[in-house]
């Protein structure tokens, strides 16, 4: 049997493969790490894996939510342990392979220098990775797991245990009448809202940037400063101000602006269609300054030679706009425009702060202006439908990621980068 095979076989117990290769210090390190792992995390792994499979067996002793969280932590810790275990196996195999080829093994000093040179990036990024795992990955895994349980108001620890129900929650979204109708109504409005609001802010921002960028326009700095001022005001403050302006009872929109033109007051807050229109207009106001600023930078980077050549060829102003300006702007800004659509698809703040997703809709668990993310919030915080909210979150994430990836792949900027 070759050295590499013997070393790999012995490495089933961490460190023994290194001992076989006469790498004593490295063997002690791996043996210590293996023993310490089970000594420190043994109880966590035992309780965690029991909890994640059973979700508890006795009330009120077992809290299913805590057991699920502990089980997910146990899975994460196990992944780290398996990674170190793989390094142990690979190291023993590679050293055994060197012995089979009659090559000298690296000295302790050489191994130390190799670890310092090759492992430095991992050491530096280690704390960030740790924070990422427990601030991002852990909540994602926890939400993902909840979607496959029956966790709701009637199955809520510590009074009740929760159970694994597989894909039943996902099936309920499409088979239970109230959930199905609400889901498709909210999804339809979410798509309309995303397309309308994003298109408005992008179109307005690019249009104003083109106007202000004209060579014969005076006081450009003044106009640019005025147009980016809405971006300087915190978004939540602007939304609350607009909520007051559109208020049916005392808002300036009805009592001052519309009254000045002799128009009767409109139900901005109590009619779903008017509320939706107000939200789209508000997002156009909130979002156009950023697009205006980026578009201005793109326009200033377009070479004047292109316009001069077009003028010599007899191109009109609109021809220059169509064949030079807009293509250059859209190619450069395609990723930014896509992120604007993605952001608005999940734009919770404006929906919640304006009127809480209202007005209420008869026979629906969502309000007239609720988008998917605000509906998920209501299901969690008001209805205690935790598993349903988690399932909707998964569907929402898959939908947004799929659309965003498809859009990125269709853009010329993505193809040129590839």
UniProtKB/Swiss-Prot annotation:
Annotated keywords: Cell membrane, Membrane, Sugar transport, Transmembrane, Transmembrane helix, Transport
Gene3D superfamilies for the chain: MetI-like
A Gene Ontology biological process term: maltodextrin transmembrane transport
TM segment ranges: 25-45, 65-85, 129-149, 191-211, 226-246, 279-299, 323-343, 357-379, 388-408
Compartment(s) where it occurs, according to its Swiss-Prot or TrEMBL record: Cell membrane
An example Gene Ontology molecular-function term: ABC-type maltose transporter activity
Keyword Transport recorded: yes
InterPro entries, per the entry: MetI-like (IPR000515), MetI-like_sf (IPR035906)
Domain ABC transmembrane type-1: 187-407
Primary location recorded for the protein, binned into one broad class: membrane
An example Gene Ontology CC term for this record: maltose transport complex
Entry superkingdom: Bacteria
Record Pfam families: BPD_transp_1
Expression induction or repression: Repressed by the transcriptional regulator GanR and induced by galactobiose. Also repressed by glucose.
Membrane-topology descriptor: Multi-pass membrane protein
Family, similarity comment: Belongs to the binding-protein-dependent transport system permease family.
Subunit architecture: The complex is composed of two ATP-binding proteins (MsmX), two transmembrane proteins (GanP and GanQ) and a solute-binding protein (GanS).
Function: Involved in galactan degradation. Part of the ABC transporter complex GanPQS involved in the uptake of galactooligosaccharides. Responsible for the translocation of the substrate across the membrane.
Protein name: Galactooligosaccharides transport system permease protein GanP
Organism this protein belongs to: Bacillus subtilis (strain 168)
Gene: ganP
């Amino acid at each position: 049997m070759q050295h590499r095979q013997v070393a790999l076989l012995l490495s089933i117990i961490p460190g023994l493969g290194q001992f076989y290769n006469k790498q004593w210090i490295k063997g002690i390190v791996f043996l210590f790490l293996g023993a310490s792992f089970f000594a420190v995390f043994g109880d966590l792994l035992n309780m965690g894996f029991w909890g994640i499979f059973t979700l508890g067996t006795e009330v009120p002793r077992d809290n299913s939510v805590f057991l699920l969280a502990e089980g997910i932590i146990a899975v994460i810790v196990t992944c780290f342990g398996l990674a170190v275990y793989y390094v142990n196996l690979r190291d023993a195999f590679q050293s055994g392979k060197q012995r089979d080829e009659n090559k000298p093994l690296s000295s302790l000093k050489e191994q130390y220098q190799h670890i310092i040179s090759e492992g430095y990036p991992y050491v530096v990024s280690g704390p960030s990775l740790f924070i990422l795992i427990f601030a991002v990955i852990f909540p994602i895994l926890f939400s993902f797991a909840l979607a496959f349980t029956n966790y709701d108001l009637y199955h809520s620890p510590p009074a009740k245990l929760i159970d694994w129900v597989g894909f039943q929650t996902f099936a309920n979204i499409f088979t239970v009448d109230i959930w199905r109708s609400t889901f498709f109504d909210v999804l339809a409005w979410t798509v309309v809202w995303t397309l309308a609001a994003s298109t408005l802010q992008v179109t307005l921002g690019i249009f104003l940037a083109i106007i202000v960028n004209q060579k014969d326009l005076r006081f450009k700095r003044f106009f640019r400063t005025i147009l980016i001022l809405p971006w300087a005001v915190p978004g939540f403050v602007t939304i609350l101000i607009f909520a007051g302006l559109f208020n049916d009872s005392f808002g300036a929109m009805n009592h001052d602006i519309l009254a000045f033109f002799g128009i009767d007051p409109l139900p901005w807050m109590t009619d779903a269609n008017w509320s939706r229109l107000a939200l789209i207009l508000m997002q156009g106001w909130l979002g156009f300054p950023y697009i205006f600023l980026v578009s201005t930078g793109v326009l200033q980077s377009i070479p004047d030679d292109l316009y001069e050549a077009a003028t010599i060829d007899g191109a009109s102003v609109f021809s220059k706009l169509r064949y030079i300006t807009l293509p250059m702007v859209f190619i450069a800004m395609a990723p930014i425009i896509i992120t604007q659509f993605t952001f608005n698809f999940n734009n919770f703040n404006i929906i919640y702060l304006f009127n809480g997703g209202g007005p209420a809709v008869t026979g629906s668990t969502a309000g007239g202006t609720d988008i998917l993310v605000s509906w998920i919030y209501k299901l969690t915080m008001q209805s205690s439908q935790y598993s349903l909210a988690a399932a909707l979150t998964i569907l929402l994430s898959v939908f947004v990621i799929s659309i965003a990836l498809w859009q990125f792949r269709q853009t010329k900027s993505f193809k040129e980068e590839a």
